[in-house]
Amino acid sequence: INATGALNSGLDDIISGYGLFENDTAVDVDFLLQGSAQGGAEQTRALATKLIQVAEARKDAIAFISPYRGSMITDTTDQEAPTVLSDADITDNVIDFFDPITSTSYAVFDSGYKYMFDRFSNGFRYVPLNGDIGGLCARTDINQFPWFSPAGTARGAILNAVKLAYNPNKEQRDRLYSSRINPVIFSPGSGILLFGDKTGYAKASAFDRINVRRLFIF
């Protein structure tokens, strides 16, 4: 485990590990989580591409992808107080990161990182939200059905979060959403929640919605 709380392993090992999920007969899985995005933009895109490849091949799972850490956070010697970029810079960085990633209805892109307490290190750290978005889908499965949207005030609440590294305003949310990226926001009175339910599909289609893709998987 490195200083940011991520596994200290190479991209090659992670990609090889995800390759084990390609066999849908031997491995039963619904959600493919990117996990840490501590590498640079190109490394994180390579991991995202692998996850999408696995999901597309299986056709019974969805990949959850967050932007690379450096798009919004610059780590310092104090891991509890890294430098966070301006919202304007983060918006541009996140859109630029996701833009080259292939169009697919088997992936969900989110807007960033939450600040949470890590009980294992007894400290706070920024963690990518892909695990949380996958968790919202799992919770929706349990409490409702896969064809319900996991977003919004009713089902989109993100738990175990103190704050967000990036809380986009309306104009920034609109830019993100039109770029296939689901904003996660802080809403007064509602807390931190997922504010979009798009897949990574670039064309206007029923399959550009998470609940529709999951209905057909179900």
Report the location of each language-model feature:
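A glycine- and small-residue-enriched flexible loop/hinge signal that marks low-structured segments
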Residues: 1-218
